[in-house]
């Protein structure tokens, strides 16, 4: 075992001891041992126990730990303390800029136990409420986490979007200098609006393909590391694989189609369309006797059968949205005031209404609203509605679903809201039976309007709790409860793979940004993308209702 590995184990032990507030003298002894071992000019693994005890600065107790590590590959003290520390907390120790003291606050005061939850808390502006944290620290932590996530080789769609579009623009300018009318499209999972991206595929069609292939290594924005006959591969500065494919224009359409995927869809369509050549993708589908299938639906499900009978859905577009539901303000853990959020929706986004759903009282970590503050917020909403009319703010709440499935307030409080988003935020470690029962009880509450982020997942960070999707969706259908598509790029929950079943059962979906600041409303674009992927039409989307329609909907939902 190398000195650095031994030192790393001692360093981890000292950090964990500090995290668990053990004796400061013992912590310092272990930390100093890590420094000492790391700087030794010889390999400590070649020494006997007696020789290790003679090393200045170690002593018998530390030497015994070193010897145990060399003989067994571990230390009892380290294993014992690891057993009492969540894995996610240990992972946090690797984040530059936060040490054990801050992690202890994150863990014990905020109830955050892994990096994914920490990243989400940064996005919700929750860290600045904790002792010793400011806005600058929060932003620095967020950037470090984003870098760490990137190192895994998988990226959120939203995190790859800017790079994809900027590279496309630069590449098009570069290509136009070679020929006047090049063809250029992004293919692959990005074109299909997949929530997770592992590579970006650019497909070029050119009348002078050989010349493009010859000159492409000089394209300054991409330092290519590999090249085959017509494929160039590079890595972005943050680790996203980028592939550029070059074809003659005559081969562009079929290769764009193949590289867009998915494999099952491509195979099904080409078995009907034949070998081509094809001038564009429309011709591929026409030759196959199919209606054109938009890229986001190409997942090898039932889209080919629907295309045969011209029964593909008329997919929702962003412009169909008339309002934004499930948002937060400074009343709980938002960055902007209620009025700022409303004016932004009205004047910048040209929406007709805003649903304000600050956190409920159990969400103490998010400054959740008690009964008195609910009354005060409703007074402010009444005043703003008079000021901003005909724009309307609906009185909502994101009510925690408690461990037994009940909501966070009495019926007397719940009936004061125009609508209620019911969400799970605590006790996430559940098996499928417990999670499903908990959700269904909340769904059956007559005051529940929308089921918020149904699985609690954080993409690339935290798996959602397991649920029986069929039972949960059936319960929503039976109780006339809307299911949220949480549009935050970290969530995109309800998963698009279950949209079709929900829509078949007559369940409305709602594209909700869960915005905690004005910029957060932009996430509705991602919700629309994922809704399209699931087959969502505007008529099946709650916040595509006009102000009159949604007012009637909420009024009809109310218990008399």
Task: For each feature predicted by the language model, list its residue ranges.
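Charged, compositionally biased N-terminal leader segments and the immediate start
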Residues: 1-22
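Short, compositionally biased low-complexity segments
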Residues: 3-7, 133-146, 243-245, 350-356
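Accessory alpha-helical DNA-binding modules that contact the DNA backbone or grooves
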Residues: 14, 26-233, 239-240, 249, ...
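Short acidic/polar active-site loop segments enriched in Thr and Asp
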Residues: 113, 182, 351-352, 449
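Hydrophobic residues within beta-strands of alpha/beta enzymes
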Residues: 184, 354-356, 451, 483
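Two-metal-ion RNase H-like nuclease active-site motif
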Residues: 186, 323-327, 398
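Charged catalytic cores and adjacent phosphate/nucleic-acid-binding surfaces used
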Residues: 193-329, 338-349, 361-391, 403-560
């Amino acid at each position: 075992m190398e000195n650095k590995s031994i030192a790393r184990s001692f360093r981890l032990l000292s950090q964990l001891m500090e995290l668990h507030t053990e004796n400061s003298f013992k912590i310092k002894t272990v930390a100093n041992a890590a420094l000492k071992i790391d700087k030794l000019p010889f390999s400590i693994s070649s020494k006997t126990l007696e020789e290790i005890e003679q090393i200045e600065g170690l002593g018998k107790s530390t030497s015994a730990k070193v010897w145990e590590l060399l003989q067994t590959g571990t230390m009892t003290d380290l294993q014992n303390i690891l057993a009492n520390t969540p894995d996610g907390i240990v992972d946090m120790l690797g984040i530059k800029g936060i040490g054990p003291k801050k992690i202890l606050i994150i863990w014990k005061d905020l109830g955050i136990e892994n990096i994914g939850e920490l990243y989400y808390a940064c996005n919700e502006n929750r860290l600045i409420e904790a002792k010793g944290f400011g806005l600058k620290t929060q932003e620095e932590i967020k950037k470090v986490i984003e870098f760490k996530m990137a190192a895994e080789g998988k990226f959120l769609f939203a995190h790859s979007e800017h790079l994809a579009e900027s590279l496309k623009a630069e590449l098009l300018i570069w290509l136009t200098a070679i020929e006047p009318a090049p063809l250029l499209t992004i293919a692959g999972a990005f074109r299909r609006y997949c929530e997770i991206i592992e590579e970006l595929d650019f497909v070029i069609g050119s009348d002078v393909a050989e010349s493009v292939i010859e000159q492409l290594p000089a394209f300054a924005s991409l330092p290519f590391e590999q090249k085959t006959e017509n494929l160039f591969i590079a890595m972005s500065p943050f680790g996203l694989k980028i592939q550029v494919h070059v074809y003659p224009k005559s081969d562009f359409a079929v290769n764009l189609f193949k590289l867009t995927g998915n494999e099952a869809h491509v195979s099904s369509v080409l078995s009907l369309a034949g070998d081509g050549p094809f001038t564009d993708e429309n011709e591929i589908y026409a030759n196959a006797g199919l209606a054109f299938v938009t890229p986001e639906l190409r997942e090898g499900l039932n889209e080919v059968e629907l295309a045969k009978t011209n029964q593909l859905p008329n997919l929702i577009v962003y412009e169909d949205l008339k309002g934004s539901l499930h948002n937060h303000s400074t009343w709980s853990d938002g960055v902007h005031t209620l009025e700022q959020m409303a004016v932004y929706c009205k004047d910048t986004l040209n929406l007709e209404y805003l649903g304000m759903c600050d956190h409920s009282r159990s969400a103490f970590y998010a400054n959740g609203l008690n009964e008195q503050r609910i009354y005060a917020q409703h007074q402010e909403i009444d005043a703003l509605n008079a000021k901003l009319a005909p724009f309307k703010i609906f009185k909502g709440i994101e009510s925690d679903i408690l461990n037994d499935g009940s909501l966070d307030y009495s019926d007397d409080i719940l009936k004061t809201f125009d609508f209620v988003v019911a969400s799970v935020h605590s006790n996430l470690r559940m098996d499928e039976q417990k999670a499903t029962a908990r959700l269904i009880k909340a769904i059956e509450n007559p005051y529940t309007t929308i089921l918020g982020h149904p699985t609690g997942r954080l993409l690339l960070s935290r798996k959602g709790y397991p649920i029986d999707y069929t039972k949960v969706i059936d319960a929503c259908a039976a109780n006339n409860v809307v299911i949220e598509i949480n549009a935050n790029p970290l969530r995109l929950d309800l998963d698009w793979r279950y949209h079709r079943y929900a829509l078949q059962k007559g369940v409305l979906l709602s594209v909700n940004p869960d915005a905690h600041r004005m910029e957060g409303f932009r996430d509705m674009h991602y919700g629309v993308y994922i809704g399209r992927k699931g087959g969502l039409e505007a008529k099946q989307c709650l916040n595509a209702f006009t102000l009159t329609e949604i007012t009637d909907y909420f009024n009809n939902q109310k218990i008399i």
